[in-house]
């Protein structure tokens, strides 16, 4: 059950992650650039200690994961700045449900096995009812409706990330630590490229000089360094948990503690 502890650590760092841009209110793409390229460069030397993956499927997972991270990061950073960390983290909790059902769709034999247990079926019905009521309450205000429309891509991105992370950890040729290093270097580099592309796409009037000023000004550098540090811890805890958890949705469900941490830390 060590994955439960790792999952709770994941929830704690997710709370910090969500609170971050509520405080700094930086451009979400700029933070994504820092997180992506910063982590990738910091951990690149460790690639020397692990063999290069030979599986094309494994490289596809890493690249696909990077694109999902780019979607998730940018939406989460902008949402926490515009709507606050509390509402954002509470709505992201619905990812647990999406991840669980997506995993069962991909592994129907596990779902069929669970259906043989009446207690589990009743529990699922109660969970579905609870999520439905919570979702209905969240979307009653105009602010929540705007948040839902904006953050929904991040919900599906995080669900996909959770499943891809488990696959990356399970199919690693060099153990879980090799999986973590390749995740930190390759997937995060791809996410940095994603955010770089959308930065220039949305800031068309900005040239290279303005880009350098936005990324390396005093107001951005220290938050960027902090982001690199605790994001690496978040990814490590998440990968360790997802590798052994029977369903990625169970680990994502531990993100339900994130709104509590947000409330305490806010």
Where do the model's predicted regions map?
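Hydrophobic transmembrane alpha-helices of multi-pass small-molecule transport proteins
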Residues: 38-43, 94, 98-105, 114-137
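Hydrophobic transmembrane alpha-helices of multi-pass small-molecule transporters
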Residues: 18, 40-47, 73, 97-104, ...
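C-terminal transmembrane-helix exit sites in multi-pass transporters
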Residues: 50, 95-120, 240, 244, ...
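Specific transmembrane alpha-helical segments of multi-pass solute transporters/efflux pumps
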Residues: 44-92, 98-102, 157-164, 221-247
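C-terminal ends of transmembrane helices
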Residues: 14-26, 70-89, 131-143, 196-210, ...
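Glycine-/small-residue-enriched transmembrane alpha-helix faces in small-molecule transporters
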Residues: 1-30, 67, 71, 75, ...
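Membrane-interface helix termini and inter-helical loops of multi-pass transporters
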Residues: 48-57, 107-116, 164-180, 206-214, ...
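Hydrophobic core positions of alpha-helical segments in small-molecule transporters
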Residues: 33-35, 64, 91-94, 122, ...
